[in-house]
């Protein structure tokens, strides 16, 4: 028992060590090219017509915070495949051959959905969101003149939040498959309040204190959870009818 525990702890230590090394190099690389990453995130907004391609900083440390935050978020996105691979290497030796095949399919599906949703969100959804917000920030009459001067940090954070919500949405197919295969739909329904509490806690920390912003941030996640449960129940009932 002690030998098995020591082996597991040694394996965890090795995996964590390589993750920390990779995280350090990735973060420094992302920070070195942070200006290029900021330009990529700002490109959907800069391509809007009749817009001055400039941002403003209202605080002395805002530029530094933007560079550090952008590099850190980019680091996590680049580190995600390596982190998933390390988790896969740690868990696979304890699985049977049939379980490995099933988990490999879920692993590939998760990665494919993640990058597909990320690409679609960045190319199509983010530009349309900023086009809509830009239209609301301009006036068509001379009675009231509103000129949009976006803050770079607020823009980056809002774009990242949209990408984060998209990343969570991308795992819905994987979650549905896991619920159907493990027959844990009832357990998920009973414990879904914990998911609601987690996302409410997340929105209170990472979003503005405005109640409407937090509601808008939580509603898509709540809708996805309910849609996942509804779809899993439909598939479960359909399989029971086929078995009769």
UniProtKB/Swiss-Prot annotation:
Cellular component aspect of the GO annotation? mitochondrial membrane
Which keywords does the record carry? Membrane, Mitochondrion, Transmembrane, Transmembrane helix
What is the protein's membrane topology class? Multi-pass membrane protein
UniProt keyword Transmembrane helix present: yes
Q: This protein is called what?
A: Uncharacterized tatC-like protein ymf16
Annotated family: Belongs to the TatC family.
Q: Which residues cross the membrane?
A: 19-39, 72-92, 106-126, 162-182, 194-214, 215-235
Q: Does the keyword Zinc apply?
A: no
Subcellular location per UniProt equals: Mitochondrion membrane
Q: Which gene encodes it?
A: YMF16
Query: Which source organism?
Result: Marchantia polymorpha (Common liverwort)
